[in-house]
């Protein structure tokens, strides 16, 4: 056997022993352009036992076969380490993957580099999942056990379904600190707590409340007991119907439960849960979520048995609250839409009861099946730990072969550069710098969950869209700048000085001679229009819609600010809207003059204004608009109260007849 150094055309180099033109014995080989390094033993051109070091500092130490990692070995990648078996370059069959910074780890079976079969996953906060896996996701039967509520991780960005496991890992091996435990759980909840619901039905009931909503008291003629329990701590009386709740479930449930990637300022209010409370789910899993039949139980006595969909109570089931009361029926996105309660006309009561009973039986069977799968997962975990210990011994042997190969390479070619140790030193130095300067990385953490460049989710915007969106949003933003500066400031001054309708009429009359002093014909034509602008500007829908495009709220404009606006023709025509946008720029300084002069003459002009209001009936519609609105406002509650009293009498009569019969 001979040896030496051989330089490849792609920039790689081999330095070590060879036989019959192939690497044999001990040696070091670098990849193209000198990137990456393998050092260890060789056999007729293939690696046998040794270690490979990537330029990033990631390493593998163990056994090889046909140029691929095969057998036992240890891989260190970023903040994660895998110890166990390898099969043709992929992780499997048994192995342990653990975090170097947190308690997060997975112990069990693998297939094609993903969790598959049976295993136990421990999350960053200490919670566990024991059961079946498929394609790297929880799939089958399993048990999810949380830690006490006070120690559970707060979910802030629902990107992944594991707290700090493989599916929370970025491409460079690092872990997202804000990874979530449930993709469809609201931001701000705790990992492993899916029964932590605020009063979703009650919040929705407030939006669609009232006795006169369609399908309530008169719609279905169905009365419920005062037992609306949609959360742990909030139990309030209500009168609801199935039709009303079915409308609430789809739209309002999404607005109160599913928050997606939002800041925690908009998180739902959490229920008052004791810090020592734990939660356990036993049942079916599909695609890494609670789907099918299952039982979720808390240590404080709350329990749900029934059907699940996407980590939510969905289907038929029964909820038992800590005080012993029950809520059973059909759920839709965590909201009870059909309950089993006393009704005037018991329609579908028996069918609902049968479906609930079947759902409870199915949930109990699924929980029993999950417990049996846990036993199998624990046995697989014990075997995986044994393989991990054997992999440590294989890594030790690989390091010894690596040291021999480096010594041989130094003897054959003393000037040969071995990049492997420098890769490891560079990675270690980066870790030390990160620990010494933690303050520099603290402000960099918040933007990572928002950008998350290493994740792709269906429906997300491609990376090129943000480049075009600022250009599109910048051009319209430049035009409303003068409007923002003029309208709110002048409107605020006028609102402080003139708070009543009479004062606004005074300003319209006082400003009339000021505007008529202009010698041009345009100003003279605009003068009578300024009288109506102060009165009709608030109820004008077209003008309000125009300014809501720029400001997001209705802007109150006075007569001296926009003299050329034709309010009488402002019923949605394009000419009036264009005048509102372009003409105020020509009269930028006119509002300042018109505001200062009427203030000085305001005390003298008050008696004239009162006389002019009585003498000049130029706009009777504007003068009578406010009293008409007041009459309608005063007559509205009276009619509502009359109908309310009638309906209450009818309801009491129906109840009286019902109790007598």
From Swiss-Prot:
Q: Which residues cross the membrane?
A: 640-660
Q: Offer one example of a GO biological process linked to this entry.
A: regulation of cardiac muscle contraction by calcium ion signaling
Give residues where Phosphothreonine occurs: 448, 461
Outline the MORN repeats, range by range. Answer: 14-36, 38-59, 60-82, 106-128, 129-151, 281-303, 304-326
Alphabetically list the UniProt keywords.
Cell membrane, Disease variant, Endoplasmic reticulum, Membrane, Phosphoprotein, Repeat, Sarcoplasmic reticulum, Transmembrane, Transmembrane helix
Cellular component terms (Gene Ontology): endoplasmic reticulum membrane; junctional membrane complex; junctional sarcoplasmic reticulum membrane; nucleoplasm; plasma membrane; sarcoplasmic reticulum; Z disc
Q: List compositional bias (Basic and acidic residues) regions by residue number.
A: 433-454, 599-613
SUPFAM superfamilies this protein is in? Histone H3 K4-specific methyltransferase SET7/9 N-terminal domain
Does the record bear Phosphoprotein in its keywords? yes
Q: Which Pfam families match?
A: MORN (PF02493)
What residue ranges carry the coiled-coil annotation?
none
- InterPro entries, per this entry? Junctophilin, MORN
Main location class: membrane
Give the tissue specificity: Abundantly expressed in skeletal muscle. Very low levels in heart.
Superkingdom to which the source organism belongs: Eukaryota
Topology, Cytoplasmic side: 1-639
One GO MF term on file is: structural constituent of muscle
Q: What is its membrane topology?
A: Peripheral membrane protein; Single-pass type IV membrane protein
Q: Which residues carry this modification: Phosphoserine?
A: 157, 216, 220, 452, 465, 469, 475
Asked if the keyword Iron belongs to this entry, the reply reads no
Query: What is the annotated localization of this protein?
Result: Cell membrane; Endoplasmic reticulum membrane; Sarcoplasmic reticulum membrane
* Annotated region described as Disordered, given as residue ranges: 228-247, 433-631
Q: What is known of its domains?
A: The MORN (membrane occupation and recognition nexus) repeats contribute to the plasma membrane binding, possibly by interacting with phospholipids.
**Which family is this protein grouped under?**
Belongs to the junctophilin family.
Associated disease: Congenital myopathy 25: A form of congenital myopathy, a clinically and genetically heterogeneous group of muscle disorders characterized by hypotonia and muscle weakness apparent at birth, and specific pathological features on muscle biopsy. CMYO25 is an autosomal recessive form characterized by prominent facial, ocular, and bulbar features.
Any idea what this protein is called?
A: Junctophilin-1
Gene for this chain? JPH1
């Amino acid at each position: 056997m001979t040896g030496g150094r051989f330089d490849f055309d792609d920039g790689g180099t081999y330095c070590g022993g060879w036989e019959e033109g192939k690497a044999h014995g001990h040696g070091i080989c670098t990849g193209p352009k000198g990137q990456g390094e393998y050092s260890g033993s060789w056999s007729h051109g293939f690696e046998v036992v040794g270690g490979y070091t990537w330029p990033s500092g990631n390493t593998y130490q163990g056994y090889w076969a046909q140029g691929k990692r095969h057998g036992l070995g240890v891989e260190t990648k970023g903040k994660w380490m895998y110890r166990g078996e390898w099969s043709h370059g992929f992780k499997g069959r048994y192995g342990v993957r653990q975090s170097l910074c947190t308690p997060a780890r997975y112990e069990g079976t693998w297939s094609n580099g993903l969790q598959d079969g049976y295993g136990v996953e421990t999350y960053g906060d200490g919670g566990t999942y024991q059961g079946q896996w498929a394609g790297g996701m929880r799939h089958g039967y399993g048990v999810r056990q949380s830690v006490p509520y006070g120690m559970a991780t707060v979910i802030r960005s629902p990107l992944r379904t594991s707290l700090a496991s493989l599916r929370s890992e970025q491409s460079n091996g690092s872990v997202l600190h804000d990874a979530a435990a449930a993709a469809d759980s609201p931001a701000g909840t705790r990992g492993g707590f899916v029964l932590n619901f605020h009063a979703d039905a009650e919040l929705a009931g407030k939006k669609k409340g009232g006795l006169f909503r369609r399908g309530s008291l008169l719609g279905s003629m169905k009365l419920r007991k005062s037992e609306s329990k949609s959360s742990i701590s909030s139990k309030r009386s209500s009168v609801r119907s199935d039709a009303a709740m079915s409308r609430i479930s789809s739209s309002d449930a999404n607005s109160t439960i599913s928050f997606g990637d939002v800041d925690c300022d908009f998180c739902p209010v959490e229920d008052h849960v004791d810090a020592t409370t734990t939660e356990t789910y036993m049942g079916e899993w599909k695609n890494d979520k609670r789907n099918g039949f299952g039982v979720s139980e808390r240590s404080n006595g709350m329990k749900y048995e029934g059907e699940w969909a996407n980590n939510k109570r969905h289907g038929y089931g029964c909820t038992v609250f800590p005080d012993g009361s029950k809520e059973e029926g059909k759920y839709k996105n965590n909201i009870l839409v059909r309950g089993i309660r006393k009704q005037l006309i018991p329609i579908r009561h028996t069918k609902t009861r049968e479906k609930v009973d079947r759902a409870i039986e199915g949930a109990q069977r699924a929980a029993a099946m999950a417990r049996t799968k846990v036993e199998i997962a624990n046995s697989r975990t014990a075997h995986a730990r044994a393989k991990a210990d054997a992999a440590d011994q294989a890594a030790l042997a690989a390091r010894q072969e690596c040291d021999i190969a480096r010594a041989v390479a130094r003897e054959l070619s003393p000037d040969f550069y071995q990049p492997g140790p420098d890769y490891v030193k560079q990675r270690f130095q980066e870790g030390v710098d990160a620990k010494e300067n933690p303050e520099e990385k603290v402000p960099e953490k918040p933007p990572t969950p928002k950008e998350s460049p290493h994740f792709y989710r269906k429906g997300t915007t491609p990376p090129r869209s943000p480049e075009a969106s600022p250009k599109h949003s910048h051009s319209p933003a430049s035009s409303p700048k003068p409007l923002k500066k003029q309208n709110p400031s002048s409107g605020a001054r006028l609102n402080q000085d003139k708070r009543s309708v009479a004062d606004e009429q005074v300003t319209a009359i006082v400003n009339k001679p000021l505007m008529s002093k202009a010698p041009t014909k345009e100003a003279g034509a605009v003068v009578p229009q300024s009288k109506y602008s102060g009165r009709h500007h608030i109820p004008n829908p077209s003008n309000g819609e125009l300014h809501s495009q720029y400001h997001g709220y209705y802007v109150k404009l006075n007569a001296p600010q926009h003299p050329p606006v034709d309010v009488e023709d402002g019923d949605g025509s394009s000419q009036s809207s264009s005048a509102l946008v372009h003409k105020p720029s020509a009269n930028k300084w006119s509002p300042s003059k018109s505001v200062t002069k009427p203030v000085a003459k305001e005390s003298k002009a008050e008696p004239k204004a009162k006389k002019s209001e009585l003498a000049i009936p130029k706009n009777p519609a504007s003068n009578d608009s406010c009293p008409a609105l007041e009459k309608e406002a005063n007559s509205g509650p009276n009619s509502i109260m009359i109908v309310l009293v009638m309906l209450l009498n009818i309801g009491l009569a129906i109840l009286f007849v019902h109790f007598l019969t």
